[in-house]
Structures are given as structure tokens and as C-alpha cells.
């Protein structure tokens, strides 16, 4: 009798978990926008308690609606949130997902700049990975307007703030001549 009850319980538990996953609500753009409204507090400061949840909502929307024209935008915004959360691995994952699924989106090259500068260079202080991100932008998007920025960022890798400032001043003086 106990064995039958245990078996029945396990079967019901399994059926319940399947039913829950099948009835998972499909997110709409309105759901995403509602989540977005919770991201900033009244002082326009990121609500760090809600940030991870909002980023997950963005990612879930993209997963459920991969052909929606706004999908690349939400992936990029999820990446931005994860930059603020200092979640480097998730940023890299989202950047790669964005480039792989939406290579023609203008958000793809932007994600490489974000990944290279804020994640690899600033947070991880890994100039080799930053260089790879910038070079990937140059190689995969040679006609994009951010290529010149990527080239400058490569030249600035490893420089101190003072050296970067001197480099900018020197280039401005050369332009004036």
C-alpha cells in the first residue's frame, strides 16, 4: 500500500511539473515594458534588487519571441544590465548570442564595444580579451561606424589615463595643422 502511494505521488509530481512548464506564460512586449519600468527608481538610479529579474525577463522574451523585431534590442539591454551587475560571463554569453542570432542588427557591433571596454578592459582588466572583442568588430563589421572607435580603443589598450589624454591632444593638434 505504501509503495503504491509513493508511486502515485511520484507520478502526480511529475505530471504537475510538466503541466507547469507547459502553461508557462508567454511574455508580450507589454510585459517587457512593465518590467523595464521597475528597473530605475525615482532618482533614475538602477534598482539593483530588480535588475537581474528585469534582465531575465528580457532574455525570456527573446527566447519566446526570437523573430520579434525588438529581440536584438532586449538582448543588448540585458547585456547592459549585466555590465552594471558586473556579471562578465553573462555579458559575454549575451554578446555572442546577439551576434550569432542577429548578426545584421546594429546592436551586434555595439555589443562588442560594450564587451571590450566595460567588461574586459574595465572590470576584468584583461587587455587581450578586450583586443579580441575590438578586433572582432573590425573583422566582422568592417563598414560599421564604430570601427574607427575600435581602432582607437586598441591603440589605447594598456595606456594610463594620462597617456590616453596626451594621445588625444596630440591627434587634435595634428588635425589642426
Describe the residue ranges of each PLM region.
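Alpha-helical segment of the N-proximal tetratricopeptide repeat
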Residues: 30-60, 64-65, 84-85
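TPR repeat positional signature
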Residues: 31, 35, 75, 112-113, ...
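Bacterial signal peptide processing site
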Residues: 21-23
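Short solvent-exposed coil/turn linkers within tandem alpha-helical repeat scaffolds
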Residues: 61-71, 85, 100-108, 124, ...
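Structural register within alpha-helical repeat arrays
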Residues: 78, 115-116, 154
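C-terminal motif of bacterial Sec signal peptides marking the signal peptidase cleavage site
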Residues: 16-19
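Residue at a conserved register position within TPR or TPR-like alpha-solenoid repeats
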Residues: 82, 119-120, 158
Amino acid at each position: 500500500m505504501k509503495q503504491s502511494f509513493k508511486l502515485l505521488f511520484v507520478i502526480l509530481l511529475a505530471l504537475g511539473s510538466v503541466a507547469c512548464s507547459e502553461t508557462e506564460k508567454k511574455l508580450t512586449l507589454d510585459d517587457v515594458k512593465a518590467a523595464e519600468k521597475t528597473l530605475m527608481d525615482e532618482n533614475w538610479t538602477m534598482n539593483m534588487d530588480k535588475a537581474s529579474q528585469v534582465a531575465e525577463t528580457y532574455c525570456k522574451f527573446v527566447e519566446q519571441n526570437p523573430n520579434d523585431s525588438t529581440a536584438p534590442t532586449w538582448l543588448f539591454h540585458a547585456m547592459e544590465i549585466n555590465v552594471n551587475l558586473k556579471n562578465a560571463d553573462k555579458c559575454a554569453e549575451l554578446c555572442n548570442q546577439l551576434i550569432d542570432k542577429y548578426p545584421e542588427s546594429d546592436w551586434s557591433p555595439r555589443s562588442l564595444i560594450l564587451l571590450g571596454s566595460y567588461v574586459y578592459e574595465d572590470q576584468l582588466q584583461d587587455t587581450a580579451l578586450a583586443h579580441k572583442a575590438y578586433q572582432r568588430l573590425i573583422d566582422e563589421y568592417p563598414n560599421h561606424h564604430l570601427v574607427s572607435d575600435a581602432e582607437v580603443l586598441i591603440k589605447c589598450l594598456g595606456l594610463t589615463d594620462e597617456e590616453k589624454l596626451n594621445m588625444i591632444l596630440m591627434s587634435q593638434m595634428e588635425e589642426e595643422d
